[in-house]
Amino acid sequence: AESLIYLAFLSSHRVANNVPLISLGAQQAIIRTEIERDDRTLNIDLEINASKANRARINGNPTRSQREILGACQIVYFSPEDLDLVRGEPGGRRDFLDRLLITRTPRMAGVIADYERVVKQRNALLKTRSSASALLPWNEQLIKFGAQLTADRIALVEALNPWVTKNYANLNEVKPASISYKCSSEGVSNNFENNVEVLTKRLEEVAYQEIERGVSLIGPHRDDLHLQIGDFPAKGYASHGESWSMAISLRIGSFNLLKSEGSEPILILDDVFAELDTSRRKQLMSATQIAEQTIITTAVESDLPAELLTQKFYV
Protein backbone atom coordinates (compact mmCIF):
# COMPACT_ATOMS: atom_id res chain seq x y z
CA ALA A 1 0.00 0.00 0.00
CA GLU A 2 2.76 2.44 0.89
CA SER A 3 4.42 1.97 -2.50
CA LEU A 4 1.19 3.00 -4.27
CA ILE A 5 0.81 6.02 -2.00
CA TYR A 6 4.39 7.04 -2.76
CA LEU A 7 3.76 6.59 -6.48
CA ALA A 8 0.68 8.82 -6.27
CA PHE A 9 2.29 11.68 -4.32
CA LEU A 10 6.07 11.17 -4.71
CA SER A 11 6.41 11.15 -0.94
CA SER A 12 5.61 8.88 1.97
CA HIS A 13 2.69 9.47 4.32
CA ARG A 14 4.71 8.03 7.22
CA VAL A 15 8.31 9.28 7.00
CA ALA A 16 9.88 12.62 6.12
CA ASN A 17 12.62 11.39 3.77
CA ASN A 18 13.47 8.43 1.55
CA VAL A 19 16.11 6.75 3.74
CA PRO A 20 13.71 4.53 5.77
CA LEU A 21 12.11 3.32 2.52
CA ILE A 22 15.35 1.81 1.21
CA SER A 23 16.74 -1.52 2.44
CA LEU A 24 19.81 -1.26 4.66
CA GLY A 25 22.91 -1.32 2.49
CA ALA A 26 21.03 -0.63 -0.76
CA GLN A 27 21.40 2.55 -2.83
CA GLN A 28 17.81 2.77 -4.00
CA ALA A 29 14.36 1.21 -3.97
CA ILE A 30 12.31 0.66 -7.12
CA ILE A 31 8.53 0.72 -7.53
CA ARG A 32 7.29 -1.03 -10.68
CA THR A 33 3.64 -0.61 -11.57
CA GLU A 34 1.38 -1.58 -14.46
CA ILE A 35 -1.67 0.67 -14.72
CA GLU A 36 -4.62 0.00 -17.02
CA ARG A 37 -6.86 2.98 -17.74
CA ASP A 38 -9.04 3.98 -20.70
CA ASP A 39 -7.91 0.95 -22.73
CA ARG A 40 -4.29 1.99 -22.23
CA THR A 41 -1.55 0.26 -20.27
CA LEU A 42 1.16 2.30 -18.57
CA ASN A 43 4.27 0.67 -17.15
CA ILE A 44 5.80 3.02 -14.61
CA ASP A 45 9.17 2.52 -12.90
CA LEU A 46 10.11 4.88 -10.08
CA GLU A 47 13.62 4.74 -8.65
CA ILE A 48 13.70 6.13 -5.10
CA ASN A 49 17.11 7.42 -4.03
CA ALA A 50 18.35 8.41 -0.59
CA SER A 51 20.89 11.06 -1.59
CA LYS A 52 19.94 12.22 -5.09
CA ALA A 53 16.86 12.98 -7.16
CA ASN A 54 14.42 10.19 -7.91
CA ARG A 55 14.17 8.95 -11.50
CA ALA A 56 11.09 7.74 -13.35
CA ARG A 57 10.34 5.86 -16.57
CA ILE A 58 7.06 5.55 -18.44
CA ASN A 59 6.88 2.51 -20.73
CA GLY A 60 10.66 2.31 -20.53
CA ASN A 61 11.27 5.94 -21.50
CA PRO A 62 13.01 8.22 -18.97
CA THR A 63 11.02 11.27 -17.90
CA ARG A 64 12.52 14.74 -17.57
CA SER A 65 11.02 14.99 -14.08
CA GLN A 66 9.49 12.45 -11.74
CA ARG A 67 6.45 14.75 -11.55
CA GLU A 68 5.46 13.57 -15.04
CA ILE A 69 4.04 10.38 -13.50
CA LEU A 70 1.66 12.26 -11.19
CA GLY A 71 -1.98 11.59 -12.00
CA ALA A 72 -1.30 8.16 -13.48
CA CYS A 73 -2.09 6.45 -10.18
CA GLN A 74 -4.85 8.22 -8.22
CA ILE A 75 -5.13 7.26 -4.57
CA VAL A 76 -7.36 8.07 -1.61
CA TYR A 77 -6.06 6.49 1.58
CA PHE A 78 -7.20 6.29 5.18
CA SER A 79 -4.78 5.38 7.97
CA PRO A 80 -4.61 5.57 11.80
CA GLU A 81 -2.48 8.72 11.48
CA ASP A 82 -5.52 10.52 10.04
CA LEU A 83 -6.70 11.33 13.55
CA ASP A 84 -3.96 13.99 13.44
CA LEU A 85 -5.90 15.75 10.68
CA VAL A 86 -8.35 16.74 13.40
CA ARG A 87 -6.14 16.96 16.47
CA GLY A 88 -2.78 17.87 14.98
CA GLU A 89 -1.06 21.00 13.72
CA PRO A 90 -2.01 23.05 10.62
CA GLY A 91 0.87 21.60 8.58
CA GLY A 92 -0.81 18.20 8.46
CA ARG A 93 -4.06 19.69 7.20
CA ARG A 94 -2.24 21.77 4.59
CA ASP A 95 -0.51 18.59 3.42
CA PHE A 96 -3.90 16.85 3.20
CA LEU A 97 -5.23 19.63 0.96
CA ASP A 98 -2.12 19.71 -1.21
CA ARG A 99 -2.10 15.95 -1.77
CA LEU A 100 -5.75 16.08 -2.80
CA LEU A 101 -4.95 19.05 -5.04
CA ILE A 102 -2.21 17.06 -6.77
CA THR A 103 -4.57 14.11 -7.24
CA ARG A 104 -7.24 16.39 -8.68
CA THR A 105 -4.88 18.60 -10.72
CA PRO A 106 -1.39 17.09 -11.13
CA ARG A 107 0.13 20.32 -12.49
CA MET A 108 -0.32 21.84 -9.01
CA ALA A 109 2.63 19.73 -7.82
CA GLY A 110 4.90 22.15 -9.69
CA VAL A 111 3.19 25.20 -8.17
CA ILE A 112 3.51 23.76 -4.66
CA ALA A 113 7.18 22.86 -5.16
CA ASP A 114 7.94 26.32 -6.57
CA TYR A 115 6.13 28.04 -3.71
CA GLU A 116 8.01 26.03 -1.07
CA ARG A 117 11.32 26.84 -2.79
CA VAL A 118 10.50 30.56 -2.81
CA VAL A 119 9.52 30.63 0.87
CA LYS A 120 12.74 28.82 1.83
CA GLN A 121 14.92 31.24 -0.14
CA ARG A 122 13.00 34.28 1.06
CA ASN A 123 13.30 33.22 4.70
CA ALA A 124 17.06 32.81 4.25
CA LEU A 125 17.27 36.40 2.96
CA LEU A 126 15.06 37.73 5.75
CA LYS A 127 17.28 36.11 8.38
CA THR A 128 20.26 38.06 7.01
CA ARG A 129 18.20 41.28 7.01
CA SER A 130 18.66 41.68 3.27
CA SER A 131 17.64 44.87 1.50
CA ALA A 132 14.23 45.45 -0.02
CA SER A 133 15.76 45.28 -3.50
CA ALA A 134 17.19 41.81 -2.78
CA LEU A 135 13.77 40.63 -1.59
CA LEU A 136 11.82 42.12 -4.51
CA PRO A 137 12.15 39.23 -7.03
CA TRP A 138 11.29 36.71 -4.32
CA ASN A 139 8.29 38.80 -3.26
CA GLU A 140 7.02 38.70 -6.84
CA GLN A 141 7.36 34.92 -7.00
CA LEU A 142 5.75 34.42 -3.58
CA ILE A 143 2.78 36.49 -4.76
CA LYS A 144 2.52 34.61 -8.07
CA PHE A 145 2.73 31.06 -6.70
CA GLY A 146 1.01 31.91 -3.42
CA ALA A 147 -1.98 33.48 -5.19
CA GLN A 148 -2.42 30.39 -7.37
CA LEU A 149 -2.03 27.90 -4.52
CA THR A 150 -4.46 29.84 -2.33
CA ALA A 151 -7.06 30.08 -5.11
CA ASP A 152 -6.89 26.36 -5.84
CA ARG A 153 -7.00 25.37 -2.18
CA ILE A 154 -10.08 27.53 -1.58
CA ALA A 155 -11.82 26.12 -4.67
CA LEU A 156 -10.99 22.61 -3.45
CA VAL A 157 -12.39 23.25 0.03
CA GLU A 158 -15.57 24.72 -1.45
CA ALA A 159 -16.04 21.59 -3.58
CA LEU A 160 -15.15 19.18 -0.76
CA ASN A 161 -17.28 20.76 1.98
CA PRO A 162 -20.69 19.33 0.90
CA TRP A 163 -19.22 15.82 0.75
CA VAL A 164 -17.72 16.15 4.23
CA THR A 165 -21.03 17.40 5.62
CA LYS A 166 -22.92 14.53 3.97
CA ASN A 167 -20.52 11.80 5.10
CA TYR A 168 -20.44 13.12 8.65
CA ALA A 169 -24.25 13.07 8.82
CA ASN A 170 -24.24 9.50 7.45
CA LEU A 171 -22.31 8.44 10.55
CA ASN A 172 -25.41 9.30 12.61
CA GLU A 173 -23.66 12.19 14.29
CA VAL A 174 -26.10 14.69 15.79
CA LYS A 175 -24.11 17.89 15.24
CA PRO A 176 -23.50 19.12 11.67
CA ALA A 177 -19.95 19.28 10.33
CA SER A 178 -18.34 21.61 7.82
CA ILE A 179 -14.94 22.72 6.60
CA SER A 180 -13.61 26.10 5.49
CA TYR A 181 -10.31 27.67 4.51
CA LYS A 182 -8.63 29.75 7.21
CA CYS A 183 -6.25 32.21 5.59
CA SER A 184 -3.49 34.40 6.98
CA SER A 185 -4.55 37.15 4.56
CA GLU A 186 -8.10 38.49 4.81
CA GLY A 187 -9.86 38.97 1.49
CA VAL A 188 -8.40 36.09 -0.53
CA SER A 189 -10.72 33.95 -2.66
CA ASN A 190 -10.70 31.30 -5.36
CA ASN A 191 -9.76 34.03 -7.87
CA PHE A 192 -6.08 34.32 -8.82
CA GLU A 193 -6.12 38.02 -9.79
CA ASN A 194 -7.86 38.97 -6.55
CA ASN A 195 -5.29 37.06 -4.53
CA VAL A 196 -2.40 38.79 -6.31
CA GLU A 197 -3.81 42.14 -5.17
CA VAL A 198 -4.42 40.96 -1.60
CA LEU A 199 -0.98 39.36 -1.16
CA THR A 200 0.78 42.37 -2.70
CA LYS A 201 -0.89 44.70 -0.22
CA ARG A 202 -0.32 42.42 2.77
CA LEU A 203 3.38 41.98 1.97
CA GLU A 204 3.78 45.75 1.98
CA GLU A 205 2.00 45.97 5.34
CA VAL A 206 4.18 43.38 7.09
CA ALA A 207 7.52 44.18 5.41
CA TYR A 208 9.09 45.66 8.56
CA GLN A 209 7.78 42.85 10.80
CA GLU A 210 9.17 40.20 8.47
CA ILE A 211 12.65 41.71 8.53
CA GLU A 212 12.50 42.04 12.32
CA ARG A 213 11.42 38.42 12.79
CA GLY A 214 13.38 36.93 9.91
CA VAL A 215 10.51 34.87 8.52
CA SER A 216 7.78 35.10 5.86
CA LEU A 217 4.54 36.02 7.66
CA ILE A 218 2.16 36.04 4.69
CA GLY A 219 1.17 33.27 2.29
CA PRO A 220 -0.50 29.86 2.10
CA HIS A 221 2.27 28.26 4.20
CA ARG A 222 0.60 30.08 7.15
CA ASP A 223 -2.96 28.96 6.34
CA ASP A 224 -5.10 26.17 7.81
CA LEU A 225 -8.09 23.97 7.01
CA HIS A 226 -10.73 24.80 9.60
CA LEU A 227 -12.87 21.86 10.75
CA GLN A 228 -16.18 22.72 12.42
CA ILE A 229 -18.51 20.43 14.40
CA GLY A 230 -21.67 22.12 15.62
CA ASP A 231 -20.77 25.51 17.09
CA PHE A 232 -17.15 24.69 17.88
CA PRO A 233 -13.90 23.92 16.07
CA ALA A 234 -13.16 20.21 15.96
CA LYS A 235 -9.63 20.69 17.27
CA GLY A 236 -9.77 20.96 21.03
CA TYR A 237 -13.51 20.31 21.32
CA ALA A 238 -14.38 17.12 19.40
CA SER A 239 -14.68 13.86 21.31
CA HIS A 240 -12.59 10.85 20.30
CA GLY A 241 -15.52 9.43 18.32
CA GLU A 242 -16.33 12.77 16.66
CA SER A 243 -12.68 13.16 15.68
CA TRP A 244 -12.71 9.77 13.95
CA SER A 245 -15.98 10.67 12.22
CA MET A 246 -14.44 13.88 10.90
CA ALA A 247 -11.31 12.07 9.70
CA ILE A 248 -13.44 9.46 7.89
CA SER A 249 -15.59 12.20 6.37
CA LEU A 250 -12.53 14.03 5.03
CA ARG A 251 -11.13 10.91 3.36
CA ILE A 252 -14.36 9.41 2.02
CA GLY A 253 -15.46 12.90 1.00
CA SER A 254 -12.23 13.20 -1.00
CA PHE A 255 -13.04 9.90 -2.71
CA ASN A 256 -16.62 11.05 -3.46
CA LEU A 257 -15.40 14.35 -4.91
CA LEU A 258 -12.86 12.74 -7.24
CA LYS A 259 -15.38 10.13 -8.38
CA SER A 260 -18.02 12.82 -9.03
CA GLU A 261 -15.53 14.55 -11.33
CA GLY A 262 -14.93 11.42 -13.40
CA SER A 263 -11.92 9.87 -11.67
CA GLU A 264 -11.69 6.30 -10.38
CA PRO A 265 -9.20 6.52 -7.52
CA ILE A 266 -7.92 3.43 -5.73
CA LEU A 267 -9.21 3.37 -2.16
CA ILE A 268 -6.60 2.25 0.39
CA LEU A 269 -7.67 1.45 3.95
CA ASP A 270 -4.40 1.04 5.81
CA ASP A 271 -4.82 -0.85 9.10
CA VAL A 272 -7.74 1.26 10.35
CA PHE A 273 -10.58 -1.10 11.23
CA ALA A 274 -9.20 -1.93 14.68
CA GLU A 275 -9.51 1.76 15.59
CA LEU A 276 -13.20 2.08 14.66
CA ASP A 277 -16.51 1.15 16.24
CA THR A 278 -19.28 -0.70 14.38
CA SER A 279 -21.02 2.33 12.83
CA ARG A 280 -17.79 3.82 11.51
CA ARG A 281 -16.70 0.46 10.14
CA LYS A 282 -19.98 0.27 8.22
CA GLN A 283 -19.42 3.73 6.74
CA LEU A 284 -16.00 2.70 5.46
CA MET A 285 -17.42 -0.55 4.12
CA SER A 286 -20.07 1.35 2.17
CA ALA A 287 -17.30 3.32 0.47
CA THR A 288 -15.69 0.09 -0.71
CA GLN A 289 -18.92 -0.78 -2.54
CA ILE A 290 -18.59 2.18 -4.93
CA ALA A 291 -14.82 1.98 -5.43
CA GLU A 292 -13.55 0.22 -8.54
CA GLN A 293 -10.56 -1.04 -6.57
CA THR A 294 -9.98 -1.19 -2.82
CA ILE A 295 -6.83 -2.31 -1.00
CA ILE A 296 -7.17 -3.08 2.70
CA THR A 297 -4.20 -3.81 4.96
CA THR A 298 -4.20 -5.15 8.51
CA ALA A 299 -1.76 -6.69 10.95
CA VAL A 300 -4.54 -8.77 12.55
CA GLU A 301 -6.97 -10.53 10.21
CA SER A 302 -9.73 -10.67 12.83
CA ASP A 303 -9.88 -6.85 12.78
CA LEU A 304 -11.48 -6.99 9.32
CA PRO A 305 -15.23 -7.37 8.83
CA ALA A 306 -15.99 -10.82 7.38
CA GLU A 307 -17.72 -9.24 4.37
CA LEU A 308 -14.39 -7.81 3.19
CA LEU A 309 -12.44 -11.07 3.26
CA THR A 310 -12.67 -11.76 -0.46
CA GLN A 311 -9.12 -12.01 -1.79
CA LYS A 312 -6.24 -12.15 0.70
CA PHE A 313 -2.48 -11.83 0.37
CA TYR A 314 -0.05 -12.43 3.23
CA VAL A 315 3.14 -10.37 3.31
Please tell me what each predicted stretch does:
Residues 1-6:
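Pre-Walker A-like glycine/lysine-rich segment at the N-terminus of P-loop NTPase domains
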Residues 270-272:
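Walker B catalytic acidic pair
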Residues 18, 132-266, 275-279, 283-286, ...:
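Conserved NTPase motor "head" modules and their coupling/switch loops across ABC/AAA+ ATPases, GTPases
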Residues 307-315:
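A short helix-turn-beta junction within AAA+ P-loop NTPase domains corresponding to the substrate/partner-engaging
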Residues 33, 293-299:
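Structural recognition of the conserved hydrophobic beta-strand(s) that form the central parallel beta-sheet
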Residues 78, 265-268:
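Hydrophobic positions in the central parallel beta-sheet of the AAA+
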Residues 8-92, 98-108, 161-166, 195, ...:
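Nucleotide-state sensing region of NTPase/ATPase domains
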Residues 17-18, 97, 104-153:
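Long, non-coiled-coil amphipathic alpha-helical linker/lever segments
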